[in-house]
Amino acid sequence: MTDHIRIEQSDRLITVAFNRPEKRNAITQDMYQAMTDAVNAYAVDDENRALMITADGAGDGAYFTAGNDLQDFAMGPRGENNPPVIQFLHAIKDCPKPLIAAVNGPAIGVGLTLTLHCDLVYAAQSATFSAPFVKLGLVPEAASSLLLPEAIGMAAAMDVFMTGRTLTSEEALRMGLISRMFDDAEFDARARELAMVVANAAPNAMRHAKALVRNRNAEITDRMMAESVHFANQLQSPEFGESVAAMMAKSPAFYP
């Protein structure tokens, strides 16, 4: 377990919150493991009816998550064939019960792509969304190469992936990436209010409704596997090395 993930249970609702503000809530392997354990426990728990992923202390420039902690990942994956990040992505993909994302700050990389596996996505007005994989010499992950075009359209998805552009909450709502947007001042209260609507709904009906809508698990799994091969290859590539070096030096990357 890690102190950088806060897990709370209240009134049939599980809250899983990023709690690493000093690192912009960048996600480490330990954090992925803690989230995986929480999602898997929730999936087989009849008492709790909704799980919400959010961040503590967002607002005033704080982040939902800045994505993966590259320094932590550079030390090498744990369980080479099934690292914690892959376990987490499969856990949220396979979860039969409602998952909610309450995005209360910038959501970068996996911060965006994890929302594609959530059934409801609420965003604060100040939240933003970006998937700058190509800027890092990487490729889309979490089946986002399949799910993002379906959510916002092929042209918009290619714009997000290829330019690394940042979407505002207003744009994300208009495109269909998020379910609802709320003013920052009321966001936490409204997100919890709606999460409780889900938590208090008929549980079997909710499960069946989710299963009917999200009925393409095999296709999504295949896409995640294909992405992971390209992602792993790019992690070992000169392009990734140049991208990280340029980012650390705050200078433009050069790809010969």
Regions found by a protein language model. Give the residues of each.
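C-terminal long alpha-helix characteristic of the crotonase
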Residues: 21, 57, 122-127, 169, ...
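Glycine-rich phosphate-binding loop at the start of an alpha helix
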Residues: 67, 82, 86, 109, ...
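CoA-thioester-processing core
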Residues: 88-94, 102, 108-162, 175, ...
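Acidic, divalent-metal-coordinating active-site segment for phosphoryl/phosphodiester hydrolysis
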Residues: 165-171
